[in-house]
Amino acid sequence: YVSVTGISNVTGIINPINEVAKLAHHYGAYIVVDAAQMAAHVPIHMSGHADTAMDLDALIFSGHKTYAPGSPGVVIARKDLIGKIEPEEVGGGMVDRVLPERYYVTNDFPDREEAGTPNILGAITLGTAIHVLDQIGMDNILEEDTQLTHYCLEEMLNIPKVVIYGETCMTTCPRAGTISFNIKQLNHGLVAAILNDYFNIAVRNECFCAHPYVEKMLELTHRIQIYKARAKNITNWHTEPWMGMVRVSFGIYNTESDVDHFIHALKDIISKQD
């Protein structure tokens, strides 16, 4: 199978998942999409394409990135595929019969994949969040998100000491929801702390659970540091203070005035850098 990220949680770049699916199916592979960063930002079409080769076989996303903290993760998959796989978890509700020497897994879905006591409150929270997103309309959310991301990118590109990671031309590489950056000669952790403590702007910093990708992109801006660390054969150089970025993200509640406040904060930090 082929596993692909729907949207990078580092750069916000949107991958053409249905085109990737067509290519995977051409070579006899299944397509599994990690939509954790995608589900709250972009309309997703798993099936119904005129060319069925563009349909997705499986899609996974996390409720906590879909405005539902404390909610369960979600797996959407073709029943004929998941039915061939032994369930990962065992417990109440996923068996038809239990004997001293073995048990019989039920063929009922989704019961066989939801062993034990379900996260009822989390499921209700997630269902409500998805309902709200559906009422707003994912096409509307993507349009607003795209405008906000483009506006922020254009403003950041006008600040000389700001380094943005990933292609910044949204015509070449569409983006949604996320921009990762660094300020030259400033540690990412310090920038994140200043934004939080002095400007009331919550950002994420470091490697965003994507260490290999972040490391590869940092080669563009931290080549000397990485070379020295590798030359010294330092095994834990990924913990060095320069190893990371700052990530700013947008939600359905953000506006251009939030971007203006963020840009002002960056300029203020840089003006007082010395």
Can you annotate each of these PLM segments?
Residues 1-274:
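Pyridoxal 5′-phosphate
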